[in-house]
């Protein structure tokens, strides 16, 4: 993938920072969008700018600016997300809108911008493995993420004439700052480990590897799919 041009939105998060490092290792050209925290990067990039991922206008403007910086955008990866684990009757209307906006609206904004601005490109969105199973207290996050999985199927059809591919990656529990409330809690971590037949939680590199596979132009016959990278969480039953 040497010299391919990739946009990464959410580049300063746990998965985003790993993906950016991995793409740099294979000599890709990077155009990075971040929210509050500027990515800590010590290698050259084409563009780095703040993006309000819950704003259609901000996403459209950022992707358009990136397009104008390079001869062709080979892929866009959208990584914004959140974890809110509560029974529905404890979730406020404000929390509901926050989760929907950060997860589903941000992904829709990327699909919207890609459909208008790009051709012959791979778009990868982030969902969660738990949309495939019924875990207690996950109603809010699966409501947002399941919409992303349906969206990649529809968008793959809508924009097939532009040679745009849309896929989603659904991680299990991954060791990132976003999941600290689980991974740093010994009891919660023990329970989570028992749900993954691989007997470990994921690392950002596990997710980065799948994203790199999907944005690689060599794999351009893959579209409209959700890939669960979850250590068996969604597909196996542990003793």
List each language-model region with its residue ranges.
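Short C-terminal tail/terminal secondary-structure segment
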Residues: 212, 223-239
């Amino acid at each position: 993938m040497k010299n391919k041009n990739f946009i990464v939105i959410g580049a300063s998060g746990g998965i985003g920072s790993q993906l950016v490092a991995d793409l740099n290792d294979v000599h890709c050209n990077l155009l990075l969008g971040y929210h509050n925290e500027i990515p800590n990067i010590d290698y050259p990039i084409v563009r780095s700018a703040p993006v309000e991922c819950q704003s259609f206008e901000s996403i459209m403007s950022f992707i358009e600016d990136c397009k104008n910086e390079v001869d062709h955008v080979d892929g866009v990866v959208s990584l914004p997300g959140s974890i809110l684990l509560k029974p529905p009757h404890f979730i406020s209307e404000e929390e509901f809108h926050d989760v929907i906006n950060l997860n589903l609206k941000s992904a829709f904004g990327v699909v919207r911008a890609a459909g208008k601005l790009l051709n012959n490109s791979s778009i990868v969105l982030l969902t969660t493995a738990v949309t495939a199973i019924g875990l207690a207290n996950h109603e809010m996050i699966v409501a947002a993420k399941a919409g992303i999985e349906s969206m990649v199927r529809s968008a793959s059809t809508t924009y097939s004439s532009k040679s745009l591919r849309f896929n989603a990656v659904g991680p299990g529990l991954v060791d990132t700052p976003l999941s600290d409330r689980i991974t740093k809690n010994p009891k919660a971590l023990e329970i989570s480990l028992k749900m993954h037949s691989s007997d470990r939680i994921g690392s950002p590199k596990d997710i980065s590897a799948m994203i790199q596979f999907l944005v690689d132009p060599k794999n351009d016959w893959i579209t409209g799919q959700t890939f669960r990278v979850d250590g068996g969480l969604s597909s196996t039953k542990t003793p």
